[in-house]
Amino acid sequence: MATLHLMVGLPGSGKTTEAKKLEIEYQALRLTPDEWHLYLFGNDFYNDEAKDYEHNERHSKIEKLMWDIAEKSLLLGVDVILDFGCWTKIERDDFRLKAHSLGVKFKIHYMNCSLETIWERLKERNQDSKNTTVFYISKESMVEWNNVFEVPTEEELTQL
């Protein structure tokens, strides 16, 4: 039976690194929106709410398209890794319900990482001028996102 693997955590917490390992371990289809977004639209993220509307709209469309691909793959018996972040319990519950409605297993992979460690990783990523695989993220954006992020409960992590 296929499994929907959901990567949960903030940018810089290690989601994509772990997702790449799981992709090999489970011979799964890994869907990482940032990779598609950068390929299709380049780096159009400005860390400015007023300027980032189009970026956010494009990102949402990519995630919807990825879900369509994930759904078809799961029905074919292929494990899928959604590397979306899923910052809120409502988002995670939605994917759990979708998995159950398809008759597949569901697993959350939570990247529990301190804000200090995340910021150190992001600073390094942000300074790499050759890095075209990730978006530049400001400390202000990171602090704001950390305030929005809902840490999964133990019950949520063990619930199938």
Predicted regions and their residues:
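Phosphate-binding beta-loop-alpha motif at adenosine-nucleotide cofactor sites
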Residues: V78-W87, E155-L160
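Conserved substrate/cofactor phosphate-moiety recognition/catalytic segment
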Residues: T17-V78
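ATP-dependent NMP and nucleoside kinases share a basic, alpha-helical "lid"
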Residues: L74, C86-Q127, E144
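Conserved GTP-binding G-domain of TRAFAC-class P-loop NTPases and closely related GTPase folds
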Residues: A2-L4, S13, T17, K21, ...
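Amphipathic alpha-helical transducer elements in NTP-driven molecular machines
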Residues: N56-E63, W67, N112, K139-N146
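Hydrophobic anchor at the beta1->P-loop junction of P-loop NTPases
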Residues: M7
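Phosphate-binding P-loop
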Residues: M1-A2, S73
